[in-house]
Structures are given as structure tokens and as C-alpha cells.
């Protein structure tokens, strides 16, 4: 089961007729969550395992080399086995369930990392970026990538229905405000299409409505062909939001750039002298 405090989600292991209580500090949710009562050990193990994964599977790990990644995963496996040894009262059936979850997590995370690794190789820094031409501009007319030649271009690929995309909007607005007089353009490209909206006309209307209601800043573009747009296909975009940074000469800086909410993006901008 899961429970929610309005900001974070916690997991809880329950059986019929269980009596269980927990305490926590909402400012340090996982770090302070502690269970007492029936099946307290099962629940405390879940929390400890979650913290273990947070410690080893950091955002920086996804930018590491394959050797560094595999070395960290080996350390995580050792730490996981050590954690199990501290909960010796738990039965084998419970650990079998947790082991299966752990293995599934490993497979999914490794697959995600390998995908990002292949992307880094395929879209190497300094190679010429794919381009787009004549996308509809919310402010009027059409816009092409070549219009931004001479400036860095930070591209946000998003859609109106995408929850994680909308989470990044406030951070993106702050970035645009902070760097409005710098040598960089912020460009948002909507991939809204008929697959979600029913018709392209409805998708287009949804895009215009959200841009207006959310008072989205930067350059707001609509592909007109959604996920089938050449630029989206050329960059092998399979999930959103996706962020891309291109240099003033039209070359790739990062084909899978940090999100606006990540401190790593500011560091990258500073390194580039933006």
C-alpha cells in the first residue's frame, strides 16, 4: 500500500488485523519515517532499502562511464545484502518478494542507463545538430532552428498533458528571467497531437490555451505533426520532457541536457560562459 502527505509518497506493508503506527518529520520524510507495531520490521526494511537506493542511484550516476556505473551497482548489491542481514527476523517469503523487486529495479535502471549511454555516443558533443524548419510560433509566424544561429539554444520538448513537463515550467520561467539578457534562447516545442487530443485541431487548441493561461515565456513552438516531426524523430525522443542544448554554431552541447530544476544546468551554463 501507499500513503501520501501532500508532497511525498510512502510505502506500507499491511495484513488484515494489523495494528501499526509510524512517526515522521515531513521536512525529512524518508530519513525520519519509523514504524512500530505489527510488521514494523517489514516496513522499516522498505524505508531502509529506499534510502539505500537513493544513496547509490544518484542523478550523477546516469552521467558516469559504463565502468563506474557497474562498479556502483556492485556496491549497491553488497549494501542490499548487508541490509537484509540486519533484519534476520523477517521470513524467506518476504525477502523473496523484495529480492524480485530489487532485481526488477536493477534491470529497469540499467536499461535506462544504457539508453542514455547510447544517446551520448550517438549525439556526441560537437556534432552538428538535427534541425527544424517553419514550426508555428505562438507569437506569430513560423520559426526555424537556424533563426537562433549565433546564440546557445536550450530546447524543451513537452506536451500539455505531460505531468513531469508541467513540473518544470516554474523552474524554466525562472531560468528565462535570469538569463534573458544573455547569449541564449529558450525554446519550447510542443509535441501535442491527435493521439491524446483526438484531433490535431484539438491538440493545437490545447497548446494555445495552456501557453496563454500559464503565461509561458520564451519561444513557444508547435510542430504540427507531434511525435512524427523530423526533429523529434532525429533526436530519437521517446519520453518527455526532454531537454537539448545547442551551441551558437548549431552543434550539439548536450542532447539530453539537465532539466531546469537541476542545479547541474546552472553549472553547465557557467562552464560555457553563458
Report the location of each language-model feature.
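A non-transmembrane, solvent-exposed segment enriched in polar/low-complexity residues
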Residues: 1-86
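Short active-site neighborhood of thiol/selenol oxidoreductases, capturing the structured segment around
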Residues: 144-166, 172, 185
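Short, internal strand/loop/helix patches
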Residues: 134-137, 205-244, 248
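Structural microenvironment flanking redox-active thiols in thiol-disulfide oxidoreductases
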Residues: 167-214, 225-233, 267
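Generic structural signal for well-ordered beta-strand positions
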Residues: 32, 43, 143-144, 253
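Thiol-/selenol-based redox modules, centered on thioredoxin-like
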Residues: 240, 245-274
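N-terminal "domain-start" segment that seeds a small globular fold
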Residues: 112-145, 217-219, 264-267, 271-272
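Domain-scale detector for complete catalytic domains at protein termini or as standalone homologs
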Residues: 64, 72-76, 80, 84-90, ...
